Regions:
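Periplasmic alpha-helical coiled-coil/stalk elements that build and connect Gram-negative outer-membrane
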Residues: 2-3, 8-9, 40, 143-259, ...
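Bacterial Sec-pathway N-terminal export signals of envelope proteins
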Residues: 26-80, 85, 232-275, 345, ...
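A glycine-/polar-enriched beta->alpha junction
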Residues: 47-57, 64-79, 110-127, 138-145, ...
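Amphipathic alpha-helical coiled-coil segments
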Residues: 58-73, 143, 147-168, 177, ...
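Short, charged, amphipathic alpha-helical segments
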Residues: 127-130, 193-202, 395-403
Length: 436
């Protein structure tokens, strides 16, 4: 009898060890090694972005390439050398001598010519190249602003998701503590099993919320690490204040619009594209004027006289082709771009107004009164589990308050995120950091 009892206990111990081993292996299978935490303030992240982002590096090379074309546009065409001489005569190759009278024998002809561009074509081509540099610079600023906006969005989103994760973790600890107390009450017969199961269901629901939050966190982390050119198992933890100031600078809509006209990258690209097309029209008109080729030539045995030196001038006669088609095409390109530029100006004004109004709405929602409400609500929540354990509130009241608290906390974190993103939307459209 003693032997059977001992064997039974040993079997149970082995089963427990096996289950523990399987649980450990399962956890190892579905978990990654602990990530290294990189704590960054926003300005630190922005500096890393400016120093290491590969898309910005590619755009910088594009600017340098355009600057090189300005230098090339200034260059004169190389002079042209044209030569002719006799190859074979009287049984001799390259015979260059004089006869008995001292007259040269054999042909030697050489001509050097230089193309002279008229109507200021070289200057107009240089102006086009300079405008192209300005376009490349604004394209660089556009890429930088777009990536910077994505950086800010990911950075602040991670901060919000981290706040959710902290809140979920605190709630899970409270629920697990409550679950442990309920197990004792259930075993003692003091509560119904349905109350215990309701708390378990709440724990499972919270686990799903934590999983969804972690997935969103991974997506934002991946985008942010790509922008910052960070690889490996690194977790970026944004260092941001818990609250966001609702104070806004005293600026008018017209001041914002005027600033946007000077700094908005999309609008400025259309402005410089119009300048480029206008300069191209001037160049096409200049191309209708013929260029002149000047040169000097020497002929050792010319028909006119030995050792002939002459002046050569050549130019095309513009009888039929006056570059009419290209001029007309360039003219309509200017008209087209004027319409595009004007449309971009209308869109810019509406975008500035829309972004600023959204900021005002969001800041109004983040008022001090709401802040006091959140503070009072969270203070009440700290005592809710204890109140339920002491039977001061029912299970239904506890569940309702618990779900409401979680929703309210998420709304507060979302509101802070919305205020930060609304500020950055205004800054992004205006083109400078006018809202701090």
């Amino acid at each position: 009898m003693l032997y059977r009892k001992l064997a039974k206990n040993m079997c149970a111990a082995c089963c427990l060890c096996f289950l523990h081993l399987n649980t450990t292996l399962a956890q190892d299978r579905y978990s990654l090694p602990a990530a290294d935490t990189l704590r960054l303030e926003l300005r630190q992240a922005e500096k890393v972005f400016l120093d290491s982002n590969l898309q910005l590096l590619a755009q910088r090379y594009n600017i340098q390439s355009s600057q090189a074309l300005v230098e090339q546009a200034r260059k004169w065409e190389n002079p042209m050398l044209n030569t002719d001489q006799n190859l074979y005569s009287g049984g001799h190759f390259f015979q260059h001598s004089v006869d008995a009278n001292g007259n040269p024998q054999g042909e030697v002809y050489a001509q050097v010519t230089q193309l002279i561009k008229t109507a200021g074509k070289r200057g107009k081509q240089t102006d086009l190249a300079r405008t192209n540099v300005s376009l490349a610079e604004w394209q660089f600023r556009s890429v930088m602003r777009n990536l910077r906006a994505q950086l800010f969005k990911d950075f602040y989103t991670i901060a919000q998701l981290q706040g959710n994760a902290d809140m979920f973790g605190e709630n899970m600890q409270r629920l697990l503590k409550l679950k442990g107390a309920q197990e004792q009450e259930l075993n003692a017969g003091n509560i119904a099993r349905k109350e215990y199961l309701r708390v378990q269901a709440l724990i499972i629901s919270l686990q799903h919320d934590m999983t969804d939050n972690a997935k969103s966190m991974n997506d934002a982390q991946s985008e942010l690490k790509t922008i910052l050119r960070i690889t490996g198992n690194v977790f970026i933890k944004p260092m941001v204040p818990e609250t966001e100031s609702t104070e806004l600078p005293s600026v008018t809509i017209m001041q914002l619009i005027d600033s946007a006209r000077q700094n908005n990258t999309d609008y400025q690209q259309q402005v410089y594209q119009l300048q480029y097309n206008t300069q191209n029209l001037r160049l096409q008109k200049a191309l209708a004027v013929p260029d002149i080729t000047l040169g000097t030539e020497f002929d050792q045995a010319a028909n006119y006289a030995p050792n002939y030196f002459g002046l050569a001038i050549s130019l095309p006669l513009p009888l039929w082709d006056h570059n009419q088609g290209n001029i007309k095409s360039a003219h309509y390109q200017v008209k087209q771009q004027e319409a595009v530029r004007n449309d971009a100006g209308v869109k810019l004004q509406n975008d500035v107004l829309n972004a600023y109004q959204k900021l005002l709405y969001t800041a109004r929602l983040s008022s001090d009164d709401n802040g006091r409400f959140y503070s009072d609500y969270y203070q009440l929540q700290k005592n809710i589990v204890e109140s339920y354990n002491n039977r001061q509130i029912s299970l239904i009241e506890f569940l309702d308050f618990f779900n409401d608290y979680q929703a309210v906390k998420q709304k507060e974190l979302e509101q802070v995120l919305n205020l930060r993103l609304a500020k950055e939307d205004v800054n992004d459209i205006v083109g400078i950091d006018i809202i701090k």
